[in-house]
Amino acid sequence: RCCRCPFYFVKTQRSAESTMTKKEALSIVFSCAPLYKENLVDRSLLFITTDKHKNVHCLEVTFDIGNFLHMTGFKLRKSGINARHFFNLCYDKRLTEADFDFSADGTTEMKMRVLPSLMKKNLSAKMLGDYNMSQPKLYTDKIAGSLSACMGFVRDGGEGRFVPNTVLEGDIRTKVKAADRIIATYRKSRSEEQYSEIVFTAKKVEWEKIVLPDEYSYLVLPE
């Protein structure tokens, strides 16, 4: 009987942690899908950052309908539902509790807690950095976020444009090698060649000292 005690303790702890219901998760993705489509789908964001030496860097990321599934952590139970179909089911509020399971490691609930705050035009991102491999099971490359929520990006097909592949809870500074400050974020639709819309501007930036890379020298900086 004694040898069962530790096992029983762990089991009750896990069940206590898993407090979110499928109904609650559906409510979250149903509210996030329209925001994702309105603010991010078929658009690109350009992050302008400065490192601790005041060097200026730029990172462009692109969003598709099919990326939404990765952000939820849902495990689909039906092979007939692909990533694009999943988004449409969420957008139309037709996804059911029978269509998915939560990830066994608790990441689905974690992603549900932070997803709403990331569905903004600028992802609510204040910092950007290279992933520091701090979570062994997590594969991502670049991370943009804040002190409470982050989004991870990888190169599409291993090369080319960066696309989102996960969302994370917690302080970005614990997840990246060095957290560069985002001083401005621009947004454009995929059909546009250049960026013109500014969706985030940091405070206390000496804009007259900012020198952009040649590729983005056309950008109009904030004043």
Q: What residues fall within each predicted segment?
A:
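Catalytic micro-motifs at enzyme active sites that drive phosphoryl/nucleotidyl and oxygen chemistry
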Residues: 136-142, 149-154
